[in-house]
């Protein structure tokens, strides 16, 4: 280990939850030395070697956790669908809403009509509550443009969010999200556009960190998704997949075949799906917000993920249709109460395993030497409180790349 004699800042006075190995890995009364945006030393304050710090920050108790990571969102979109929420509760079916121009197509229409500036302002409004909860990294998907111009517009807005706010933004091209209205009855023709036009151009402009698709009866077949994944491979982009949310199509197995970094939703994943994911190193991203809003009854196979040691990540799935959720903390509680995950598993789901689901585990997700100095200081005494409390208990401070975030 390289000896550290100087650092830019030294932080101590709180217990540190490092989340190394997916466990709390508590350091009582810990200390963190930071140079630039990296952690250069971490451990018990009593074992701190002689280090000259240009600045010292003393916490008065509390807990430090890694910065939270929301690894699956659809934050950039136009319009509002709260009226549909009310309609459904008044007995109008989803099919009736869609037949009258509602549903995802209404979001596509509004997104296409909105300017980049309008989309940016709306997304900023949605992102700020997540920042307030201690989110330091977020993934944002396209998927409401469904043509080259609008998909690129969405991804540009997502990239811009990361430039305007102190947060790391990872972008995902989800052009294969739904069938646009101009291609009704022609899904293979639309997949041609996705593979031959949208993905290559997104790659050329460096607007996406990954490619995603929705494998479901109401979206795209495994064969169509495979074409999307082949196009992503050709463009040099890793893949992810919305899989097994509403039915068992073996999408998770297809994702594993392409060594997807994650397969998401997974309520209907089978044991063979889980085995394939385990062998491929594919992370299971669980989305309790959508499960809750859709009043689903089949939970993801949590025990199988445990048995086969598939990492379980959690995310808000923030979107206008099935998960209008702007709280990652709420997802911790829902994962525990609805999916019977433990508070430790849930916290791993929004830190180390979420980092793995985005392919950034080498730099984020745990607190250890060499990783980014992203953490949250909480006025709490036990990490289980993060999943226990509903509302309140916001962070005392958030540190992003070595600096206190305003």
From Swiss-Prot:
Belongs to the metallo-dependent hydrolases superfamily. HutI family. Its cofactor is Zn(2+); Fe(3+). Pfam families: Amidohydro_1 (PF01979). Keywords: Cytoplasm, Histidine metabolism, Hydrolase, Iron, Metal-binding, Zinc. The gene is hutI. One of its GO terms (biological process) is L-histidine catabolic process to glutamate and formate. This is Imidazolonepropionase. 4-imidazolone-5-propanoate binds at residues 81, 144, 177, 245, 322. InterPro entries: Amidohydro-rel (IPR006680), HutI (IPR005920), Metal-dep_hydrolase_composite (IPR011059), Metal_Hydrolase (IPR032466).
């Amino acid at each position: 280990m390289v000896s550290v004699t100087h650092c830019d800042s030294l932080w101590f006075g709180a217990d540190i939850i490092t989340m190394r190995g997916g466990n709390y890995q508590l350091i009582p009364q810990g200390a963190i030395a930071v140079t630039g945006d990296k952690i250069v030393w971490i451990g018990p304050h009593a074992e701190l070697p002689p280090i000259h710090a240009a600045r010292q920050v003393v916490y008065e108790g509390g807990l430090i956790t890694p910065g939270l990571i929301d690894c699956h969102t659809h934050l950039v979109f136009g319009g509002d669908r709260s009226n549909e929420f009310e309609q459904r509760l008044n007995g109008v079916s989803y099919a009736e809403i869609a037949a009258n121009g509602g549903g995802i197509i209404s979001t596509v229409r509004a997104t296409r009509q909105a300017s980049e500036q309008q989309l940016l302002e709306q997304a900023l409004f949605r992102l700020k509550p997540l920042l307030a909860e201690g989110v330091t990294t977020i993934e944002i998907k396209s998927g409401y443009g469904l043509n080259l111009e609008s998909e690129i517009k969405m991804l540009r807005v997502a990239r811009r969010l990361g430039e305007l706010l102190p947060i790391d933004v990872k972008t995902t091209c989800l052009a294969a999200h739904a069938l646009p209205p101009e291609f009704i009855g022609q899904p293979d023709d639309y997949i041609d556009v996705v593979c031959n036009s949208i993905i290559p151009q997104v790659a050329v402009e460096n607007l996406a960190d990954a490619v995603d698709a929705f494998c479901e009866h109401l979206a795209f077949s495994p064969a169509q998704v495979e074409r999307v994944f082949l196009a992503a491979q050709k463009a040099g982009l890793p893949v992810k997949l919305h899989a097994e949310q509403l039915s068992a199509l073996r999408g998770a197995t297809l994702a594993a075949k392409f060594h997807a970094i994650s397969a998401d939703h997974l309520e209907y994943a089978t044991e063979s799906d889980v085995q394939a994911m385990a062998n491929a190193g594919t992370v299971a991203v669980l989305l309790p917000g959508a499960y809750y809003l859709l009043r689903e009854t089949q939970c993801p196979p949590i025990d199988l993920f445990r048995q086969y040691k598939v990492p379980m990540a959690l995310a808000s799935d923030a979107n206008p249709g099935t998960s209008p959720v702007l709280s990652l903390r709420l997802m911790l509680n829902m994962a525990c109460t609805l999916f019977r995950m433990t508070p430790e598993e849930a916290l791993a789901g929004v830190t180390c395993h979420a980092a793995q689901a985005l392919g950034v585990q080498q730099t984020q997700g745990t607190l250890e030497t060499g990783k980014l100095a992203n953490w949250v200081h909480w006025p709490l005494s036990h990490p289980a409180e993060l999943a226990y409390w509903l509302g309140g208990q916001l962070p005392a401070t958030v540190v992003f790349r070595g600096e206190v975030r305003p």
